[in-house]
Amino acid sequence: MIETVPESFFKTRLRGQFHKARVSQPRTRPKRIARQFLCLISVVAMLLLPYSAGTALGKTAPGTRSNKTAARRGSEPKPERLAHAVTIYRDIYGVPHIYGPNDASCVFGYAYAQAQDNFKQVEDSYIHALGRAAEVDGPKALPSDLLNRALEITRLSQEEYQRTTGRIREICDAFAAGLNYYLAHNPEVHPRLITRFEPWYLFAFNRYALYQLFIFGKAGIKDNEIKPASEYKDIAAQIGSNMWAISPQKSADGHAMLLINPHQPFFGPGQWYEGHLHSDEGWDMSGASFFGSPFPTIGHNQYLGWSHTVNEPDIIDLYAEKFDKASDPLAYRYGDGYREATKWTETVKIKTGSGVETKTYAFKKTHHGPVVAERAGEQLTVRLAMLEEGGQLDEWYAMSKSKSMAEFKAAMSKVAIPMFNAMYADRDGNIFYVYNGAVPKRSTKFDWSKPVDGSNPETEWQGYHSFDELPQVTNPPSGFVQNCNSTPFLTTTEGNPDKSKFPPYMVGEGDTPRAQISRRILAKENKFTYEEWAKDAFDTHILQAERDIPALSVDFDKLKQQDPARARKLEPAVADLKGWDMVSSIDSKPMTLYALWFERFGQLKGAGDKDPLLRMKALEQVINDLQRDFGTWKVAWGEVNRLERRDTLGDQAFSDNAESLPTAGGPGWLGVVFNFYTRPQKGEKRRYGVAGHSFVSVIDFGPQVQARSILVFGETADPSSPHYFDQAKLYAQEQFKPAWFALPDIKAHLERAYRPGEETHTMAAGH
């Protein structure tokens, strides 16, 4: 029996989902993916079609020992041989440096190290990637599972593994073997669901991360976690990442330098893990990845480095399909005739208070993609760039093996990675930026801001734009490039791409305050030392305050004329703001006043408050709140803005009574480089970080690559480990740790060395 979802369920989650279905005017630029599809994971219930009792049950859920798909077994390596070949060097911050004779052995060790440090998160990511989250998390996870099943992530991933050969297949096999080896040697670890990992899971994880976390779910940042000024500012445009690169002409030591600065959630599947893989085959990759990735996807090797930020290329389209053949409910119009839709079923297990409930859902798809909604008698299907083709793992692997800018561009020219800006620097002094995306070529005859006619063959995608057709900047005269989830047409001050040379549907972003402050920093005439480069990664100048405080001052002058008594009460606070240097610090009291005022003003404005002196009203409310909670409105920012570590999955509430650290960062919509987004929590006076500067790395590409890095908390999720919260203390002080790269340096700062499965027998440092 099929359970239908109440209409109220859709109303609370369809916000912006099918904007294309409602727009009447042609668009001038692509609508933001985050706005169109941010909550589609909940809409998938619209995919649930009438299910007849005579229809066969769906596929067996993946990830169980009874699963007998063709993709289950590859040429799996002998784990004992791999384990004996690998050495894991843990430096004094717990970062694993994996040394092995070949790339596959390093991946095996990297999987083992991840499982040691946070098996709970690795497994959770894969549970979601397989569309089985409801089995452990209950009904709240059902929308995610249904989207996963609608996108057929399991089938596509199994098929991709089957057609994969060579190194990528070896990597998949080795990663699964590493996780399974960990479970075999740690019987005290009890998985919530997955007792054996299969090689094809890596492809499922890639699809889940790309299409469910980023394209549909905004990287796992919960909408209710960061929403203080969403009605006033376009939060989707401000939550993101920073990346910078400078050429030798801007560097005091004559080397290119790179800043890697993704702003990801501190908890859940989007958090970062740092590691270093060194193979005797020449692979030497250091950086960060999500838990569940087989190697770092941002970072550097001995020749070059790169970073990513989220961008919004138009890689999704909706098609209106006509199912109007009475004799055949699966027939849909196409051209002069009909095509046959495919119908299939999926069985989903859902954890309940009394056990596990099993439900079966029916899905339908055309050649464009799965049916996701019905509008005016037509059924809408969604098409996603590169969902079926895959190839992302191959592209990232080739990027990590590159030795020059030409090789790096050749690796990216596959355009298998459907989105993400990329920024690059190398030891030859080159810098490079590309607005990467698998952007479909489309006929200009149609308005792609709305669902297009699926029966018209002219609406078919005409392939993808090539890598050379994407906006990009190489070695600009300005000597720098930056991207902060911002338009590629303002990447630098000299040498930007010409917007008129690109189709209007290609680029979805405008400028952002973070990009504006970044260009100001990078355009300075002085040359950057490595120390200055590292310091600027945590810059706390508040650009937005330069605009807001003068406007607030004007309104205060009006208030003095209209209500002198009310103005006298606000005068000390206004004076503090006007005298502020507009730089955040943990000791800054004006920063507290301004940041909370900005949020309150946005909330009031978004709620439709038409008070002509709304800025003053917001300031009064913030002052009252601070006096209520702290006994004074003069409260240091570090007293309010805190860093606290809780359970890795993000399910544990913050507490004012738990250990936490003061932090100077602020939300990106204030135009600050040091991004630190907080979540107010009922019953607590302080606010705690949930996203922002999550992994930061600064790299100097001299003859010997020099790097520093920092994770927001530490390398492991084990509260009993010294590496659970050790990096947080540096982070809160806006400091980095060394990211040792050469083996002699690693051994000089070694905590322990061991082979997988033999960690209780620590090897000598000289091994």
Task: Give the positions of each predicted feature.
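Signal peptide processing junction and immediate N-terminal pro/mature segment
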Residues: 48-65
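N-terminal secretory signal peptides that target proteins for export/translocation
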Residues: 1-34
